[in-house]
UniProtKB/Swiss-Prot annotation:
One function term, GO molecular function aspect: phosphoribosylamine-glycine ligase activity
Pfam families named among the record's database cross-references: AIRS (PF00586), AIRS_C (PF02769)
Gene Ontology cellular component annotations, sorted alphabetically: cytosol
Name used for this protein in its record: Phosphoribosylformylglycinamidine cyclo-ligase
Gene coding for it: purM
Amino acid sequence: MSQSGKNGLTYSDAGVDIDAGNLLVEKIKPAVRSTRRPGGDGEIGGFGGLFDLKAAAFTDPVLVAANDGVGTKLKIAIDADYHDTVGIDLVAMCVNDLVVQGAEPLFFLDYFATGKLDPDQGAAIVGGIAARCREAGCALIGGETAEMPGMYSSGDYDLAGFAVGAAERGKLLPSGDIAEGDVILGLASSGVHSNGFSLVRKIVELSGLDWSAAAPFAERRLLGEALLEPTRIYVKPLLKAIRETGAIKALAHITGGGFPENIPRVLPKHLAAEIDLDAVKVPPVFSWLAKTGGVESREMLRTFNCGVGMIAVVAAENVAAVSEALEAEGETVITLGRMIVRDEGAAGTVYKGTLAI
């Protein structure tokens, strides 16, 4: 007989706490309301989230959708018991993928799965999601919280995000006029962002440090906290530069695969990106990872952003205007390389210089 009473088993006996789920919804409602924007001003709790595209003031929009997760960076958050920033990563990974196509993020939905729901932990995660939805200008219109005992170990959870944006027809990126001699600008990252954390965790294991140790690469910070530095969101600076200058031909979000996997995705087949590694300002975290793990430069470049979280392709005569527009919004911009003719069978990304790790 169930311990819950003489009437047999309950859902709670099976490990699912409906009351905890309801409590979480109440806890996150103020954060969700704070993300309202034109077109997205409904309440959570319905069977589906609503968005009024007409109210967003587009004339002839094309919708752009993206979804992503945070990967094994979550394992550090779980082990370090620090959950406030992973929601930021979740939003960033999705909305940065929208803006590279010239799209303005409109709305966001999240999926939070766990073995046992902790409403306070869930509220911390959703609070991070809501904060960065505000930063990106998109409404958090819904989501799913799944308590799944037996699917996840105690304390473990996973996150997925889904974002939809829009661009006016004819304004999507990349444009069709990328040419030899165009300049590649690099926008600084905030750290490791949300890729390569299986390797990061392996290196930390080899180092013998734990998450509460002092970070060897960051003064007055704990290792776990420093590695959880959230992914930078580039949306508003890039949208402003796109609209003010009309000069950005392509953007690439430097995520898993680094330069060699991500930059060629936005280039025509006859062109390659020549990257000047001497221009890359490598943050200390990457130098520590490379030295501690004995990771070669080529492997670093195909695993991590190495200090450049986004690139933009512009004509040489527009470098100053685009750089100034981005810097006015707080971005750190470097001249990273240029477009060259790609020989048949050659790689889409080639390097000169040396990565300073």
